[in-house]
């Protein structure tokens, strides 16, 4: 498909390009929070204020073509950024300005919480997870540093395919996620459709690396019914390598482009997520600490701590 046509489709879907390879998109939970119809599980679990969250990516390129991804995978088929590389401060400023423009559509909504809308003009949190693989952006440390200077927290999500980049990161995010989509190499290949030949070794190296990072770390399992909700002992062994502060066990949602590759039957119920989380708990030292039925997600920790929820006061 022509890339300009794909770009138009993405813009129609709510994406805004903030540079040559970076973009922003308002999260569904940000929209809901602005009209007081619920908040993201990250607000319940970690204290992130949904209406003040900016969902973005510094790089839309990705080494995987995950079958559960709701994003359109066709736009960037290269593992390198071609052309001009967006500057960190430009990305941040453009994300905020584009998000403000997108939020203006709420001004005519009679249910709009005006206090939240005013606060939303200046995000306090960046979810670096909207699309692509952030570690393909060469100035990721500088981006995180700029966010820190502005008093903005960051949750960074990686697929773990670039362990050397993780190792070389000299500015750590507030919270670092590694996606663990499968318990075995064979299942991973089926679900994530990696482009790199040594994908399993790369993932395992990343898991080992984050065990020593001095920041909040998370292993996230995206559970697809009938495909990867199995081999709990294998999952447990991988989790032990990473020794994360948190484990998120979240159900796959049948939305976006993933509907072309999966069936609604692949979307597990919250009860099934909780049951699977209990099985993971049996083989690890982690316990279910919290859950959110609407998001079909369970949070596991070795023990709950007072600093679980971030303080934004």
Describe each model-derived feature in a short phrase.
Residues 51, 121-123, 292-296:
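Short Gly/Ser/Thr- and Asp/Glu-enriched loop/turn motifs at secondary-structure junctions
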Residues 1-60, 64-68, 72-101:
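Flexible, acidic/Gly-rich N-terminal and inter-domain linker regions that tether
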Residues 107-263, 267-271, 275-276:
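Conserved AdoMet/S-adenosylmethionine-binding subsite of the radical SAM
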Residues 79-114, 121-127, 131:
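Glycine- and small hydrophobic-enriched segments that form the cores of compact globular domains
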Residues 61-65, 185, 254, 307:
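Short, acidic Gly/Pro/Ser/Thr-rich loop/turn segments
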Residues 270-313:
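C-terminal accessory regions of radical SAM enzymes
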Residues 29, 59, 131, 301-303:
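Structured loops at beta-to-helix junctions and adjacent beta-edge loops in soluble globular domains
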Residues 95, 99, 103, 207-210, ...:
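Hydrophobic, Leu/Ile/Phe/Ala-enriched alpha-helical segments that form helix-helix packing faces
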